[in-house]
């Protein structure tokens, strides 16, 4: 998976269950691999409501993304389905990202039940150094599944995301402590404009094709 799209939706008050059900159906209809997470720990508890994050993946290049978008915009049924979900939400955002760390290899029988997303914002001129350091630390982390390093195609130029998967909260926490120690030793904090921020979500739906 070289490229993937995240859909971040914040339901209107009382509409969470409807949004969850609608997003699950929408994911199933894409015919692409993906998942849906519900937050269990958010980076900013004062924000308006919680957000559900869905992912559509399996794009090997940007031409495949173009093809999917063109077919989506030309399909009235798809547009109606997305509009009906948006009508239940306070806010909706789409984020196209590039996977910078290669395929995510999972051992047989592994199932990701939790996903954490940590964002690092590089100082001006330090993005390449930050990326190289994160990729190096990724290889040294003692986890069942290596995290994925990615970048959004829009937004702040120095922003890099590290996505970690685990089967349990304890496993996720053990991986976090291991990663923090190795990141500190590698001098990552010296390359950042601010402290990293992190969210944790539970996988409530997955699509495998």
Regions found by a protein language model. Give the residues of each.
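Short S/T/G/P-rich N-terminal loop/turn motif that feeds into the first structured element of a domain
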Residues: 1-209
């Amino acid at each position: 998976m070289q490229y993937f799209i995240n859909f971040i939706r914040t339901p209107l008050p009382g509409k969470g269950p409807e949004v969850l059900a609608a997003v699950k159906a929408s994911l199933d209809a894409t015919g692409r691999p993906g998942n849906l997470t519900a937050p269990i720990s958010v980076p900013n508890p004062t924000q308006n409501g919680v957000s559900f994050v869905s992912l559509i993946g399996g794009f090997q290049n940007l031409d495949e993304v173009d093809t999917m978008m063109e077919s989506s915009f030309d399909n009235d049924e798809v547009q109606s389905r997305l509009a009906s979900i948006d009508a239940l939400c306070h806010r909706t955002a789409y984020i196209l990202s590039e996977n910078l760390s290669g395929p995510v290899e999972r051992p047989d029988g592994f199932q990701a039940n939790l996903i954490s997303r940590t964002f690092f914002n590089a100082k001006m001129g330090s993005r390449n150094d930050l990326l190289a350091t994160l990729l190096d630390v990724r290889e040294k982390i003692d986890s069942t599944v290596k995290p994925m390093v990615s970048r959004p195609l829009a937004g702040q130029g120095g922003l890099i995301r590290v996505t970690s998967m685990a089967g349990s909260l304890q496993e996720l926490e053990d991986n976090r402590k291991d990663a923090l120690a190795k990141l500190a030793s590698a001098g990552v904090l010296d390359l950042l404009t601010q402290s990293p921020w992190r969210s944790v979500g539970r996988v409530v739906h997955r699509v495998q094709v």
